[in-house]
């Protein structure tokens, strides 16, 4: 029994239960940041550990309590443009622009020919009797091309100039115009339906491609023609001694003119017979005016040239017709 008891005690002492505690690290704590390699500030005992801070959770936009104190009307600009803040350099609308597609003026055919003519002229002035190979200011062994020889015929024929060679066609490519001035004229005459304008009816109806308008329009050439005719008439009135104004008298002026009309011819001093009027507004009988014009080309009253123009005096004839009716 003693052995059994001793064995039981020994067995119970050898198989004693062992309790082991395992600590799990919290999952919601941020890990310690990794220190850079070779850092001298690392503490072996962990006394300098960085306290982990919980990350703040951003408020959800779907939450009813979410709000912002910023101005709601202020929205970020999607497009933004800023000028260079420099004054525009070109303000002449390319009025002085030049054609830059042609050969430069210092190396084109005209410039080469001008240099050749100048070289020949200088060589003749220096030594007119020099040989052809010694043309120019350089040595006689320098070859300057077929056109570099001295012109020994100078003075016996028409001299070579650029202006004289242009017409003959021997100048070569002519220099293009550097400046070009264009004037455009636009005539906005509408295409009006002729049938609708004259009759007010068009067989095509609304499908007509011309404009249905019965108004009066004048194109540019018509306006210019009327202006030229008015200017000619004004200059003619000035040449005849008038003031050149085209003022048309009103009814009051017409009444005054009727009262100022003469009742007899200035020449024969008798009532008018076929009255006529001159440019200077003097009234005569037709027979008296022609008889006086055959002797003197000037007016009988004011001595101004009549130029042989005698118009029918409609005012005198109307007044004579009214007097007969009364």
From Swiss-Prot:
PROSITE patterns: ZF_C3H1, ZF_RING_1, ZF_RING_2. Keywords: DNA-binding, Metal-binding, Zinc, Zinc-finger. SUPFAM superfamilies: CCCH zinc finger, RING/U-box. Residues 1-142 are annotated as: Disordered. The keyword Cytoplasm does not apply. Residues 104-125 have a biased composition (Basic and acidic residues). Residues 1-14 have a biased composition (Gly residues). InterPro entries: CWC24-like, Znf_CCCH, Znf_CCCH_sf, Znf_RING, Znf_RING/FYVE/PHD, Znf_RING_CS. This is Zinc finger CCCH domain-containing protein 15. Signal peptide: none annotated. It comes from Oryza sativa subsp. japonica (Rice). Transmembrane segments: none annotated. Pfam families: zf-C3HC4_3, zf-CCCH. GO terms for molecular function: DNA binding; zinc ion binding. Gene3D superfamilies: Zinc finger, CCCH-type (4.10.1000.10), Zinc/RING finger domain, C3HC4 (zinc finger) (3.30.40.10). A zinc finger (RING-type) spans 265-303. Residues 24-33 have a biased composition (Basic residues). A zinc finger (C3H1-type) spans 187-215. GO terms for biological process: snoRNA splicing. Residues 81-100 have a biased composition (Polar residues). GO terms for cellular component: U2-type spliceosomal complex.
């Amino acid at each position: 029994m003693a052995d059994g008891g001793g064995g039981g005690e020994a067995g119970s002492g050898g198989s004693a239960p062992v309790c082991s505690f395992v600590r799990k690290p919290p999952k919601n704590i941020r890990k310690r940041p990794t220190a850079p390699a070779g850092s001298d500030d690392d503490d072996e005992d962990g006394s300098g550990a960085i306290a982990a801070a919980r990350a703040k959770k951003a408020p959800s936009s779907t939450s009813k309590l979410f709000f912002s104190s910023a101005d709601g009307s202020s929205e970020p600009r999607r497009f933004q443009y800023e000028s260079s803040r420099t004054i525009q350099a070109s303000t002449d609308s390319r009025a002085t622009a030049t054609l830059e597609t042609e050969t430069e003026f210092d190396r084109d055919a005209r410039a080469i020919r001008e240099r050749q003519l100048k070289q020949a002229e200088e060589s003749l002035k220096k030594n007119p009797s020099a040989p052809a190979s010694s043309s120019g200011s350089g040595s006689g062994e320098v070859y300057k091309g077929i056109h570099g020889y001295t012109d020994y015929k100078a003075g016996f024929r028409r001299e070579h100039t650029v202006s004289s060679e242009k017409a003959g066609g021997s100048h070569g490519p002519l220099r293009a115009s550097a400046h070009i001035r264009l004037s455009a004229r636009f005539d906005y005459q509408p295409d009006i339906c002729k049938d609708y304008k004259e009759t007010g009816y068009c067989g095509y109806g609304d499908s007509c491609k011309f404009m249905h308008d019965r108004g009066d329009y004048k194109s540019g050439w018509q306006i210019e023609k009327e202006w030229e005719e008015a200017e000619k008439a004004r200059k003619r009135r000035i040449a005849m001694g008038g003031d050149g104004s085209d003022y048309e008298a009103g009814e009051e002026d017409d009444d005054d003119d009727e009262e100022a009309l003469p009742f007899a011819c200035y020449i024969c001093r008798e009532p008018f017979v076929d009255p006529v009027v001159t440019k200077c507004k003097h009234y005569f009988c037709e027979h008296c005016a022609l008889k006086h014009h055959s002797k003197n080309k000037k007016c009988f009253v004011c001595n101004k040239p009549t130029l042989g123009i005698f118009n029918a005096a409609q005012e005198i004839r109307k007044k004579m017709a009214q007097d007969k009716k009364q």
